[in-house]
Amino acid sequence: MKPSIVAKLEALQERHEEVQALLGDAGVIADQDRFRALSREYAQLTDVSHCFLAWRQVQDDLTTAEMLLDDPEMRDMAQEELKEARGRLAELEQQLQILLLPKDPDDERDCFLEVRAGTGGDEAALFAGDLFRMYSRYAEARRWRIEIMSASEGEHGGYKEVIARVSGDGAYGRLKFESGGHRVQRVPATESQGRIHTSACTVAVMPAVPEAELPQINPADLRIDTYRSSGAGGQHVNTTDSAIRITHLPTGIVVECQDERSQHKNKAKAMSVLGARIRAAEIAKRQQEEASTRRNLLGSGDRSDRVRTYNFPQGRVTDHRINLTLYRLDEVMEGKLDNLIEPIVQEHQADQLSALAEQE
């Protein structure tokens, strides 16, 4: 490994020990904000620290084995140990390179998940419902909380559009590669001839950012409409104009929220989603202007970004970005997504590593 990388790892190791000591300090424990910030930093440094300590240990083992090569009685054993240590060293160096990759500061945040029915009418709305259920199951398995912010139900079930907040450690970092077009091929329940129909949905995932970090929105740029909510809610539905529709005039972004009975709460929820959408649009524009020729595995949430095809007759799901096909569609629809998410995360890391190599 390059001396500059080793020096960086030594500095991180020292900081890990320093933070560990600070977390035991009474003054730090009394300051809850600082304690929380240091706890997060400690958690982020722990993996790289442990990996670097393991790398150092293997380096020591390697040196010991090389010294034993001069001893005729120990040579065979030393050669075996050398082979094993070199293999382990290569593995640890690869892990350390990945751990040192620049982190997306949004990765640890909660996120907003939007699923919208596209082409395909009722069948697209039903599939949007299936996708939302799939993500909900995945969130439950990871002990994340999922809260519907706004939903427009399809006439025959499912959703025309559903927006939810997913709260939990690393929710955005795990789900961010889901943005884009999701296509389904299956025989609809209403199809009497048994013909396979193709319909589509779009998914958009945006980090939920604290209000202080959101773009400043000029109230004069907003048009706010109120209307009577529809859908579930019993006697309280359609009795007051509690539903809110906010239009951001400069961008044309529209957010609706009718989940709460209180107009004030619906407005607060809609504003948080609007801020996240405006921020996401600004970041996407900036990335486009930087116009990297390198492929971007992070979809824009546009249907033109083909993410996956879910083929029910064949029981397969295909990720078009990395040409990955799995014949485990039933498991995937039940929320077992790690076999799809992990390869795309690894591919993204490989792209980052090759970008760093080109810069050196």
From Swiss-Prot:
Gene3D superfamilies: 3.30.160.20, 3.30.70.1660, 6.10.140.1950. One of its GO terms (cellular component) is cytoplasm. The keyword S-adenosyl-L-methionine does not apply. Pfam families: PCRF, RF-1. The keyword Transport does not apply. Methylated by PrmC. Methylation increases the termination efficiency of RF1. Peptide chain release factor 1 directs the termination of translation in response to the peptide chain termination codons UAG and UAA. PANTHER family: LD18447P. This is Peptide chain release factor 1. The gene is prfA.
